Amino acid sequence: MPLYFAYGSNMDVEGMTRRCPRAKPLGRARLARHQLAIMREGWLTAARDVRGDVHGVLWDVAFADMRALDQYEQLASGLYTKAQQPVIGERGAKQALVYFGANAGPGVAAADYIAGVLAAARNWKLPAATIARLESFAAAAGVARSAPPAGGEPASSPRVRPRFATPFDRD
């Protein structure tokens, strides 16, 4: 089964389970030499940045669920592209599929979308720098700041389904 690295709305366990019912979260991971950015359509992408890391969630996705994931990310319309990239998970480095948005920003995040991503990032207890970056995107989108959830396992975040995906870095 392919590994998939999620850094946006697919970090949400409940939403990902609806889209890809056989997928299993493997834990937190990071994509080195990239930085979160907002594309023109208002969704996240991972843009190349030698000084940055994008933190997210590594999933084990069944082949039977890949079509649904590609449809959700609007791969056929060209909103996103996907590529195999090395990611560093809790159990070491792995090759994983990563979706990159085709329209590199700058943009302003869609408010409901970024609120859901921020909730999922907090639930997964992603690093403070990642939370701060997402909070800055949320503030720019006019999303009110909320307190992080109390301990425990990652919970589901609000049901958010972006109409578009993330911008692809075309260097």
Segments (PLM) and residue ranges:
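Glycine-aromatic micro-motifs
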Residues: M1-D171
